[in-house]
């Protein structure tokens, strides 16, 4: 569909900024083949050095891909992983990163999630917004988070590093999960106190009722 091709265009041209002379590898499986095809078509508009590989489902996140797939991953500069289960935390992905590939991973991506929601973001605008949020975190040491559903926590950052997940993956060795749009910071050990309420989903499963985690000095002391 045009909506899928539009999202694929954003991934190829904005997130990865693929260049004409680059080798591009798209990895997909039977459950995500439609997404893989649209990514292939848009990449082919930029470069003719494009390969689409369909592999069997790995059945669980983190399981190594077949050896031929791992081998070919090491030989490409740009890799797009659109598979049901994540390959992010595999030796094959780590080796490809070490060889200088830049990688975008979209575990569990399907037609609906590819056409709508976070995948349709303006990633150039998102990069500017995330950068602004990241600079705020770097200047602050005490963080308080609250929500209408009942989350109320405080913690210290302790001057930890801040990771900006903005979806732009244009340098060798970079890896990004899409859709993006997060700022990460580790709390200082023992500094977090309060309650976190999760009222949406947990590990990809919609919750029937909210999940509350009570935290004291950085440790979860009660779950209800």
Predicted features along the sequence, with ranges:
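Dual-mode signal for accessory low-complexity, basic/Gly-rich regions
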Residues: 206, 222-224
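Active-site bordering "gate/hinge" segments
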Residues: 1-208, 212, 216
């Amino acid at each position: 569909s045009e909506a899928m091709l539009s999202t694929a265009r954003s991934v190829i041209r904005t997130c990865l900024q693929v260049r004409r002379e680059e080798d591009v590898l798209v990895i997909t499986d039977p459950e995500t083949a439609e997404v893989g095809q649209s990514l292939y078509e848009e990449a082919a508009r930029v470069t003719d050095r494009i390969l689409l590989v369909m592999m069997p489902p790995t059945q669980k996140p983190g399981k190594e891909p077949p050896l031929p797939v791992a081998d070919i991953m090491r030989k490409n500069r740009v890799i797009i992983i659109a598979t049901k289960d994540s390959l992010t935390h595999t030796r094959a992905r780590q080796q490809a990163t070490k060889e200088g590939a830049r990688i975008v991973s979209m575990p569990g991506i399907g037609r609906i999630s590819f056409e709508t929601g976070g995948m349709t973001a303006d990633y150039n605008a998102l990069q500017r917004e995330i950068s602004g949020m990241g600079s705020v975190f770097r200047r602050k040491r005490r963080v308080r988070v609250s929500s209408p559903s009942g989350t109320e926590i405080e913690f210290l950052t302790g001057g930890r590093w801040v990771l900006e997940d903005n979806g732009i993956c244009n340098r060798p060795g970079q890896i990004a999960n899409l859709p993006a749009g997060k700022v990460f910071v580790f709390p200082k050990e023992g500094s977090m106190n309060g309650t976190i309420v999760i009222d949406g989903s947990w590990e990809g499963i919609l919750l029937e009722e909210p999940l509350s985690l009570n935290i004291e000095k950085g440790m979860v002391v009660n779950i209800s």
